């Protein structure tokens, strides 16, 4: 029987990053993956291929505006097969990259279905053959799958999940998206750019409901301006397929019954944890609706059994959260680095629609509900010279701070390069920086990023460019 210090079930961002760091810190590590490739949902049917399409949409939109930049383009068109081919090339490049990194860092891998088989034991089943592994520590990072609504079956042809919409043979003329979280608005943005008539149905009062209310409102306004039809407080009653596609019937916010027909329907209503048939029901692990309860260092109620990523109760289902959860856990196991437990409010949210949205920390409402005396500052990108140069000056940065101490509580961005320029704010909150700390930080000019200097100054009523 093979023996390891750590066996990780799942090779998504959480699994593979943790496996490499564990090996770097001296643990003999095995990564078990049910599929024939490493990287998980994020790399193959999630974050990475979606961002390829979003970048292609951005380029396509730039061609539409070429005349504004003094460039005459007489004719251009979207080559969808070539777009899909590049998407696959990007995915394959990075899948091979993980294989290389495993070899470089001496991480063993094994394909098959991994299960907990008792303290210190894992079984891996493939093609009817079962291999037993002994491991001092066992970690599950098995990820999640798309949810649907009761009575609505994802058939992969007309009613789609995030997997099938990435592999469509042609760009649909019409598309209904059920759900307006990150997945919903990103695909709405992509296909709107490519000429699809898009309708978004959201059950809650606003789109991107985890974001600050002002950000959600600004994004809805921007998407509607692009021609995307959005219904909030829309309760889907049924999705019925027909020869032309499907018809989605829903009750709108006034109580009126409405329907919209489209070639394709994307279900973007959240994700369910993949914790069935892992042997966890035989352990002391506490499960709630399939999610695993963990302690501050991702430990479960079963000794030396850990959980990370989308299966963890109460934590965001984000690739970068999974990675840091695993690394923090391994730091604790090995004692190689002192790392504090991962805090939910220190995990950035990034949504790559157009305009982009990014945030870190508490929203204004959450800060007030937490009892803070809140002071905010806001700076519009229309006052930023680099944003004007780029031709993308919609949106703003909003800073939420504690009036008593000036500590940064949250930063919320909608606008150009939001998912990149949020990085300063992530570091600032991690270091418990204040408004004054960032006001005394030199921001390079001209950059989109320097808008942050004006946003924090706005908290003091001292913004220069607005």
Model-assigned labels for residue ranges:
Residues 1-12, 171-178:
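Beta1/beta-strand and adjacent pyrophosphate-binding region of the FAD-binding site
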Residues 1-4, 20-27, 33-171, 199, ...:
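Glycine-rich flavin
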Residues 7-9, 114, 133-143, 178, ...:
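Short hydrophobic core segments
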Residues 9-14, 18-35, 41, 48, ...:
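Flexible, glycine-rich terminal cap/loop adjacent to redox cofactors
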Residues 15, 184-185:
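N-terminal Rossmann-fold NAD(P) dinucleotide-binding loop
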Residues 19, 23, 188, 192-193:
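Gly/Ala-rich phosphate-binding loop of Rossmann-like dinucleotide-binding domains
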Residues 111, 295-296, 402-403:
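Short, acidic, Ser/Thr-enriched surface-loop or helix-capping motifs
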Residues 155-172, 259-336:
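FAD-site-proximal beta/loop scaffold in flavoenzymes
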